[in-house]
A protein has these predicted regions:
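Conserved beta-strand-loop-alpha-helix junction that forms the acyl-donor binding cleft
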Residues: 49, 75-85
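Conserved GNAT acetyl-CoA-binding A-motif
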Residues: 58, 65-77
Length: 123
């Protein structure tokens, strides 16, 4: 998915609803065993960093999940990516443990979406 303003791309992200095999090896505990969406990658254009685009992206992800009847979102990020870990925690994601993916340790996060949340009402 792309988030843009006019002809400018502000952000790019990949959302997958098929699960992630490496999440089965979590060293820790997921918040739920419900079907979930995975945000595989998110990149914000340098011109748009610090403008809340990541938070807008997560709101849109939650709205898409609600439309699909999915109430769990999982994300992993490199252990050294303090900025993304901050963005995840700021947007209500809880740290669940670590996984081994792509030859490195990743920090894994999950957020539960309220079932009665509507558009712009997800938590």
């Amino acid at each position: 998915y792309f988030i843009g303003e006019g002809s400018s791309a502000a952000a790019y992200l990949c959302i997958d609803f098929a699960g992630e095999a490496s999440y089965e090896t979590l060293q820790g505990s997921w918040k739920s065993d419900l079907p979930y969406a995975v945000v595989h990658r998110m990149a914000i254009s340098g011109a748009y960093r610090g403008h809340g685009i990541a938070s807008i992206a997560f709101q849109l992800i939650e709205e898409l999940c609600i439309q699909k009847g999915i109430y769990s979102v999982r994300v992993d990020t490199d252990e050294k990516n303090a900025i993304m870990r901050h963005v995840l925690e700021k947007n209500g994601f809880d740290y669940c443990g670590t996984i081994w993916f792509d030859n490195s340790v990743k920090y894994a996060y999950e957020k539960m979406i309220k079932r009665d949340a509507g558009v712009n009402g997800a938590v």
